[in-house]
Amino acid sequence: MQTILTAERLWDGARLIDHPVVAIEDGRIASISTRMAGDLPGAANILDFSGATLAPAFFDVHIHGAKGHDAMEATPEALGTMSSFLASHGTGNFLATTVTAPLDATLRALAGLAKLLAEPPVPGQARPIGIHLEGPFLSHAKRGVQPAEYLLAPSTATFDRLFEAAEGHVRLMTIAPELPGAPELVAHARSRGVRTSVGHSMATAAETQAAIRAGAINATHTFNAMRPLDHREPGILGTALTCDSLYAEMICDGIHTAPEMVKLWWRAKGPERAILVTDAMSAAGMPDGEYMLGGFAVQVAGGRAMAGGVLAGSVLTLDRALKNFMEFTGAPLEQALRLLTVNPASMTGLSDQVGSVAVGRVASLVAVDAAGKLVGSVVNGLAVTASR
């Protein structure tokens, strides 16, 4: 039986369509029309999101865990639990994100993730569409909670071991541009189809620009774990804000970055280069307590995830990030939606698969109200009740 979605509007990733009718068959979008084109089929399962806007499901390029599980567990239970939780918050696709750990442990996690990522998408669950390596090529000074003893110097040989363990599923890698050999590794990763993001870094502007010339395309959680802005040495942060070609992530939870700085970032990057991420860890969707991020313990209380007095990821979800962003900046809905759909898809080179609504695509859509609040979603062809 067909599933039919109706709503006030559809934002398909490029344009707004009034009174849309989206037909879904066998988990894919079969047609897109409007109510003006005729009556709805009588035999269909009709989901009416009156007053809401349909849009592509969200894409989180930086998430470590959720609902008590960490991506580096690399088990069907861990990824399945994460994926179900993410779907209930409007996320249809995500990059399973690692943290710095002993190299052998990272290789084992990547091998396990590779097997899971090769499985077909599960209806009603967000799809892990790739891997984001956050570490081990990070700055000691700006490592955050990532363990110093496992950080490594940039090395094409080490990268190749990681890439091959993941069976080519690595889509994004964070690297500190000031480390010796960083530009060469950025170029090497690019040659293997991996996008690189500058972050966890004390880099100068010149060092950051060298990484960008080598192919770096993104900045990891802007403002966090970065050399502070200085009017004589803009550093990695000033470069991230002013380089027109560079995408820039934001953890928009009101904890990692003040609303005023979110507004500054938005004015600098605009609707073409800004990306919302969660950087969520295993405590997302769970009560306060102690949880794991990779191999170390994190204390969570009142929405803050802390380890050793340092923020250690978040408990944010992308639906909350969207609403926060609109409240902090006053951005219109169709611009705000780009930050969770079109932009992350473009940055990762996955625009041919995700980030837009089109006939033939996997049916993963959200319905949001005018304030950006999630009211429902369909993920991999199956309707999912929005979590509150």
For every predicted segment, state its role.
Residues 49-108:
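Metal-associated gating/positioning segment near the N- to mid-region
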Residues 86, 133, 189, 219, ...:
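Conserved, mostly hydrophobic/aromatic
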Residues 1-4, 9-55:
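Histidine-rich, glycine-flanked metal-binding segment
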Residues 160-286:
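Active-site core of metal-dependent hydrolases
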Residues 65-76, 145-152, 195-199:
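Active-site mouth loops of central-metabolism enzymes
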Residues 235-250, 254, 266-278, 283-368:
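His/Asp/Glu-enriched, well-ordered alpha-helical/loop segment
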Residues 83-169:
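Divalent-metal coordination cores built from histidine and acidic residues
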Residues 75-78, 112, 155-157, 232-237:
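Charged helix-capping and loop-helix junction motifs
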